[in-house]
């Protein structure tokens, strides 16, 4: 399997992972900010990031915002978000299939 997943420690976040698939060109960071109200809920931003740090900064900001949005709405979900870097990839079914494998790896976190 060409999918590689690495945990990244970030203060104030429950879990942050970086996933790479060399075959599909997946370069994805998933950030789970807070699950005190329930499992994380958020979406996917597909963007051409100039650097890993830009991608990480964006996904951290977005996942924290999802925690706040879900709390304000009074729903029982925490905040999470994914950022896919499209700088070296095209939006293909294979790319998003490999992203789905990363989500499956988290088993509902």
PLM segments and residue spans:
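N-terminal ligand-binding/catalytic initiation module
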Residues: 1-109
């Amino acid at each position: 399997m060409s999918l590689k997943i690495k945990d990244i420690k970030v203060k104030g976040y429950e879990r942050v992972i970086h996933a790479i698939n060399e075959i599909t060109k997946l370069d994805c960071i998933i950030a789970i900010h807070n699950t005190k109200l329930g499992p994380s809920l958020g979406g996917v931003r597909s963007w051409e990031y100039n650097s890993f740090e830009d991608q990480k900064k964006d996904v951290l900001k977005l996942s924290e915002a999802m925690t706040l949005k879900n709390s304000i709405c009074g729903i029982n979900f925490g905040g999470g978000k994914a950022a896919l870097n499209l700088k070296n990839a095209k939006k293909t079914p294979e790319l998003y299939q490999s992203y789905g494998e990363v989500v499956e790896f988290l088993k509902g976190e």
